[in-house]
């Protein structure tokens, strides 16, 4: 897989402090026109949240397209140069740099870009519908590669001064332009770090087309494995007493005596016990296919 030059728009640095891009998880439909933030990128992806919950497809697309065009006309966003860009994120104790690139969705369909978890089917369909309506990717898909097999030090390639830099919470985000040409790199495989539903949305648009999507590609050695919790509900017709027996088909299961000793393990809390699970060697080639969250 060769990284392609990103064909995208960049936010004007002087508007960074004024622009919002909230998650749909914290938005409701109880807005009046006066409460709508004028520089809110969610108006592109989900105009129905702010204007009317029951928009026709034509109304949805028109509102999204018109707002996007207004950002261009007002020079709040501008067309990027024909260069590669690097994205860097810094905290007090960690930093990592990734390559901003376009990739072909066919590489995901052919399993060259691999997920690390299964998705909610309904949410994947929702992302596909959004992309079909607005024809716009608001958030990149975050990938990583095994840098033990590729000699690529992204830290030495960017210019000293970022074209965009801002702080959000504990993190500083920077975008750098680079004169380096990364088109000769050939990734054998990439892995989805974040954006499983977004990439599935692209996959469902039209599998016959060479659809491109924007990604940020990080070296594996620089990525942090952060703790993440999920609450899993059993289907109504599933006998939960069989759960551990079913799980043992794929995993070695050990009970943890002390909760504090669970760092860097997959852990399940079930029926009052903390259980460490390790994937059996016979199933390592299956990847995420040994886990299925269903609908």
For every predicted segment, state its role.
Residues 1-295:
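Surface-exposed, charge/polar-rich loops and edge strands
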């Amino acid at each position: 897989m060769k990284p392609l030059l990103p064909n995208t728009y960049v936010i004007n640095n002087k508007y960074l402090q004024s622009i919002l891009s909230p998650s749909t998880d914290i938005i409701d439909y109880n807005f009046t026109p006066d409460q709508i933030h004028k520089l809110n990128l969610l108006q592109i992806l989900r105009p129905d949240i702010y204007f009317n919950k029951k928009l026709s497809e034509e109304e949805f697309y028109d509102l999204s397209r018109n707002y996007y065009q207004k950002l261009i006309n007002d020079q709040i966003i501008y067309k990027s140069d024909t260069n590669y860009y690097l994205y860097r994120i810094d905290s007090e104790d960690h930093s990592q740099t990734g390559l901003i690139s376009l990739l072909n969705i066919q590489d995901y369909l052919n399993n060259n870009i691999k997920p690390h978890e299964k998705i909610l089917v309904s949410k994947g369909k929702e992302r596909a519908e959004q992309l079909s309506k607005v024809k716009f990717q608001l958030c990149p898909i975050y990938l990583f590669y095994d840098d033990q097999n590729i000699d690529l030090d992204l830290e030495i390639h960017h210019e000293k001064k970022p074209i965009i830099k801002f702080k959000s919470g504990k993190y500083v985000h920077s975008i750098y332009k680079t004169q380096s040409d990364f088109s000769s790199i050939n990734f054998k495989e990439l892995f989805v770090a974040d954006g499983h539903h977004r990439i599935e949305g692209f996959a469902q648009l039209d599998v016959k087309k060479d659809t491109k999507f924007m990604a940020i590609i990080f070296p594996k050695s620089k990525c942090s494995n952060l703790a993440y919790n999920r609450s899993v509900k059993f289907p109504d017709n599933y006998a939960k007493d069989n759960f551990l027996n079913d799980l043992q088909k794929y995993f070695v299961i050990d009970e943890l005596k002390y909760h504090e000793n669970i760092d860097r393990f997959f852990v399940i809390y079930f029926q009052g016990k903390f259980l460490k699970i390790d994937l059996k060697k016979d199933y390592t080639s299956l990847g995420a296919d040994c886990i299925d969250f269903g609908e």
